[in-house]
Amino acid sequence: MRGHKDMSQIKAVISGVGLWTPEHSVTNDELVESYNAFAEKFNAEHVDSIADGSVEAKPLSSVEFIEKASGIKSRYVYVKEGILDPDRMTPNIPLRAEDELSDQAEISLKAAKKALTAAQKSATDVDAVIVSCAYTQRYYPAIAIEVQNALGIEGFGFDMLVACSSATFA
């Protein structure tokens, strides 16, 4: 893109792709055990409200239901701690300081480095960073800008935030 004045002469090339897969995973067995403990605790704590109809009981789940409904047997997770805690049911991801890379930028950076290696390119060969993500950890800066800065890429950065379809749009 550098040096081009006529946009018709720009040729976009994807010369490498990179993927980073988290080291942790949660199986359906683990998920069902944790969720059912959460549901049983909730139902026990709200027994009177459930009986009078003001609160709906949490149904129990099963491995078979999850696999039939989604086809998923296991899912990779960035941070496993907290996900299977029936009192929490969400990952425990500590907040980072504003001057640190966001968790999402750190993940993107790992994938970007793999893409550069696959393409046999360096950061100076890259004109644009496009990041697709379902949501962002911070309002500013954009994840693509964080990746650009971390790798020393010139050009532009763009976050494509299209919820669950982000990857398909990118």
Segments and roles (model prediction):
Residues 2-125, 151:
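Conserved "HGTGT" condensation-loop signature of ketosynthase/thiolase-family condensing enzymes
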Residues 127-134:
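Short glycine-rich or small-residue beta-strand-to-loop segments that form or flank ligand, phosphate
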Residues 142-153:
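A glycine- and small-aliphatic-rich helix-loop capping segment at beta-alpha/alpha-beta transitions
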Residues 155-161:
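Short pre-catalytic strand/loop immediately N-terminal to key active-site residues, enriched for Gly-Thr
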Residues 161-170:
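Active-site-proximal alpha-helical scaffold in enzymes
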Residues 135-141:
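Secretory-pathway/luminal and periplasmic proteins that interact with or process carbohydrate-rich
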